[in-house]
Amino acid sequence: MSQQHLLNVCLPLEDPGSLFEIIINDDRYEKITKQPSYLQRKDFKTLEALNSSSDSFIDCQGYVLLPGFVDAHMHLDKAYSLSKVPNASGTLQEAVINYRKQSPHFTVEEIEYRAMKTALNALSHGTTAIRTHVNFELPLGEDVVFRALTAVLNVKEKLKQYITIQVIPMFLLPDDDSKRELEWIEQAIKMGADGIGGAPHLAENPEKQIDGLFSLAEKYDKPIDLHVDESDDPNVCTLDYIIQKTMERQFHNRVVAGHLCSLAPMEQEKALSLIERMAAAQIGAVTLPGANMYLQGRFDQGIVRRGVTRIHEILQSGATLAAASDNVHDPFHPFGKADLLQIGLLTAYVAHLGSGEGLKQIIRMITEYPAKLLNLNNYGVRCGAKASFVLLKARSVEDIFTNLPVERYVFRNGKLLYQSKKAEHWNDRQLLMYQHETESQYVKFERNLQYV
């Protein structure tokens, strides 16, 4: 039986003013108790002194522990393709066209390389679960259509003991009900798809697409995760029909809608009505602030729309809302590094969530809420749950988003998988002394900080 013992842990979502002692037995949390004070134990290693996954007694020094991040919407197959697929206009339309043109030239091996690189980057930043959408372009033919899915499934298998990866093929059902192409879709599901995906708002007949996707989900008992209304045109609104189908087919808690950009410019009463109905149908939502801010509002002048959905209204409705990475260094989004703290910071900016409570909500949007959307069992920092977590060199949620700490210690099922240490050194003795003095004053000025 393996055991780990952690002292002086900060759990900001539990009680930011207290420190906790945590005992992990055989990859699960066994004991989580509030400490009466900061504990000094010489037999415990500090985070800086950790050198292997076998270190069992850890003094966390008041640093933050969060459950492993959950990235509810990525595109592992497209990531790091920007050098081969440019997007001069910066529009969604050009990104789609250019990526489709280049797709026949991508081998399974290359796609697998890019997907693996992205998954490892995500894991190193603290993400322990990913849901990735994968292109499945029927018009490209049988030789090409399965490449991305095959590559990402290979990565999922190789990393299964380290990170949870759910794979969602993006289906565009053929208009002519081609038997051969429908067989390809069913083959893709049987290969190991974890759900049914698509972008029906881009189809010529969105309602027919939605009907077909729900039928596939029913037939194979799969959840649905769709790109929905990724447009700054308020008249683009497939969400209405998706809500209808969710209610009719009794797919409550089994449908996720990503993007929802057109809700933002939509007339207030209509948007709020849709959000209320979405919450009643128990449809989950994912906001993608990086890609949406980059792609949307391209033709605006003066006041440029942010392109991000109505975050406050969705949260207030009671619907589950996650924030996720979407694309990483590709024609849809040229930036990013699969770091959900970076995405959390973008979300905080765009939704004006900068207060202490607002930042806690951001943390939930990259942990607890997406875990619910992905139906992850045994998740969270609680007794009996799997001990998958990230320790950050930060002492509060405000500290996290002020500094985006580089130093992170990533654990999966109680095992240390990755640690990053920031190399720092003041070459001037006087500056070094000031630095040490500043660090020593943390307890006096910040540890028990209360807002007036």
PLM regions: where:
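Divalent metal-coordination and catalytic microenvironments
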Residues: G62, H73, G126, I196, ...
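Alpha-helical scaffold segments that flank or form the walls of functional sites
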Residues: L65, L82-H133, V144-K160, E186-I189
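Histidine/acidic residue-rich metal-binding segments in metalloenzymes
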Residues: R147-E157, D177-G284, Q301-A323, Y379
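His/Asp/Glu-enriched, well-ordered alpha-helical/loop segment
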Residues: P223, Q244-V255, A291, L295, ...
